Amino acid sequence: MKWLSRILTVIVTMSMACGALIFNRRHQLKAKTLNFNHKALTIIIPARNEEKRIGHLLHSIIQQQVPVDVIVMNDGSTDETARVARSYGATVVDVVDDTDGKWYGKSHACYQGVTHACTNRIAFVDADVTFLRKDAVETLINQYQLQGEKGLLSVQPYHITKRFYEGFSAIFNLMTVVGMNVFSTLDDGRTNQHAFGPVTLTNKEDYYATGGHKSANRHIIEGFALGSAYTSQSLPVTVYEGFPFVAFRMYQEGFQSLQEGWTKHLSTGAGGTKPKIMTAIVLWLFGSIASILGLCLSLKYRQMSVRKMVALYLSYTTQFIYLHRRVGQFSNLLMVCHPLLFMFFTKIFIQSWKQTHRYGVVEWKGRQYSISKEQ
């Protein structure tokens, strides 16, 4: 069995080498104090049955050091979303129904929201997002100014978890970030064409010039289409990590919601990662199974060194935790038991593949969307 021990050691070592390459380029926001004596921007929040989440976002907006307008686009909510939003002083606008079925996801609400914005700068923020610091919006504006107040800026919020099951989102969140290509030196450095969806900042002129969310009207995950629309007009598209300014808490409704959400995400958003980066990601993830396999076999066969296999497992686990700490706050127990996370990721991946290629339909928040129509 010594030969198997050597093979597994080589596999895990190669896996960790790939892990060192998939997220070795950082894109972090830089804080700076700005002075505004007028409304700095309009924040547009698409919301459908978000009464349990939107209050946290609106409270964090009130705490910001710069004055902003807030528009909540109420997309057919059947709960108290509108009442909660008004209690924080937000303007609530009901989304006009899409009777023709031409729009998917939140793009319809976002596009209508721009017509109500009174500032040139506009930001689209998901209802489950929270600004962690009082200078968060200020920092976003500063970063946008650094790119000449042109194009599109997007942020992937830091993922905060409170209940154990929420930690099963760990690998998905890391893949969302590294799958954007630009966080790896394996990227060829060409113009970025993709954007994160939870937080985006742009200006009206560029928004309408590119078609804005109209270019993503058939997309459930709108970030890729939005980024491509801006790139096609030779406008800059930038992506940033949220910590320590922006965070979100996902799928508070329960484990079923988490499964449905990531199935939707993988069904519609897994095609933008470049092949060599995707290969490195797959090889890195495979190290999770290889390391636990070596550990289990060493406990059964004396020819394999338990000490070496434990060291191998702990080495991979250390890197696994290190990379995930950049994108979120997850259960230490789940981080150590990463093979469970890998198996869950694989299960959802297979499920999303079936929905995409066999059924062609994905369901989210009580609505069904045909993936086959999505371009």
UniProtKB/Swiss-Prot annotation:
May I have one GO cellular component term? plasma membrane
| Location in the cell | Cell membrane
Cite the EC number. Answer: 2.4.1.-
Which gene is annotated as encoding this protein in its UniProt record? crtQ
Keywords, in A-Z order: Carotenoid biosynthesis, Cell membrane, Glycosyltransferase, Membrane, Transferase, Transmembrane, Transmembrane helix
Instruction: Give the protein name, as stated in the record.
Output: 4,4'-diaponeurosporenoate glycosyltransferase
State the signal peptide span. Answer: none
For this protein, the parts annotated as crossing the membrane are 3-23, 164-184, 277-297, 330-350
Q: In which pathway does it act?
A: Carotenoid biosynthesis; staphyloxanthin biosynthesis; staphyloxanthin from farnesyl diphosphate: step 4/5
| Pfam families attached to this UniProt entry | Glycos_transf_2
Q: Name one GO molecular function term.
A: glycosyltransferase activity
Alphabetical GO biological process terms: carotenoid biosynthetic process; protein N-linked glycosylation
Q: How does it sit in the membrane?
A: Multi-pass membrane protein
Question: Superkingdom, according to UniProt?
Answer: Bacteria
The UniProt family comment states: Belongs to the glycosyltransferase 2 family. CrtQ subfamily.
Q: What class of enzyme is it?
A: transferase
Q: Can you name the source organism?
A: Staphylococcus aureus (strain NCTC 8325 / PS 47)
